[in-house]
Amino acid sequence: MNSFTTKQIVATGIGAAVFIILSRFAAIPTGVPNTSIETAYAFLAFMAVLFGPITAGLIGLIGHALKDAILYGSPWWSWVIVSGFVGLGIGLIANRIRLEEGGLTTKKIILFNATQAVVQAIGWIVIAPVLDILIYAEPANKVFVQGAVAATSNILTVGVIGTLLLVTYAKTRSQAGSLKREA
């Protein structure tokens, strides 16, 4: 079993801080109460592919919990849990994409977007509303609308900005086997 490396610990701390900043200053209200278009999830998805499920899950959990505590006075745990779930779920494909090796193919981009769409749909349309009802006794009609809006906006945001982050980063990496020894 791999141990948690110093690089992953640093990535978790910096990632959580960036998540908070993006959630605070780069979010666009949707008109649905307590629901915004969040660029932080594009960053979370990028970190998930770069560092894997544990680091990304922690970034989502810690970043969202601290953001809620700073902005609202206390975390809204049902959505904090889903942020961790989203990071963890997307991070599960990190070994299949291998972003550090460069060579981000169309197939890998499709895998990334299919995965993030499924994970976010499950998280925001199912898990978050059900936990809102169970933990906070919120009205079902309200939380399922919030969940659907969050899912749609986050899937689109990650699909556009997250994909751009992956493509841009992959261009900075040398492809495995691309260097040849001169005679």
UniProtKB/Swiss-Prot annotation:
Keyword Glycoprotein (UniProt): no
Entry coiled-coil feature ranges: none
Pfam families: ECF-ribofla_trS
Protein family (similarity comment): Belongs to the UPF0397 family.
HAMAP family: UPF0397 (MF_01572)
GO cellular component, one term: plasma membrane
Membrane topology qualifier: Multi-pass membrane protein
UniProt protein name: UPF0397 protein EAT1b_2102
UniProt main location, coarse: membrane
Origin species: Exiguobacterium sp. (strain ATCC BAA-1283 / AT1b)
Record-linked NCBIfam families: PRK13661.1
Superkingdom of source: Bacteria
PANTHER family: UPF0397 PROTEIN BC_2624-RELATED (PTHR37815), UPF0397 PROTEIN SPR0429 (PTHR37815:SF3)
Keyword entries, A-Z: Cell membrane, Membrane, Transmembrane, Transmembrane helix
InterPro entries the UniProt entry points to: ECF_substrate-spec-like, UPF0397
Transmembrane residue ranges: 9-29, 42-62, 74-94, 117-137, 147-167
Compartment list: Cell membrane
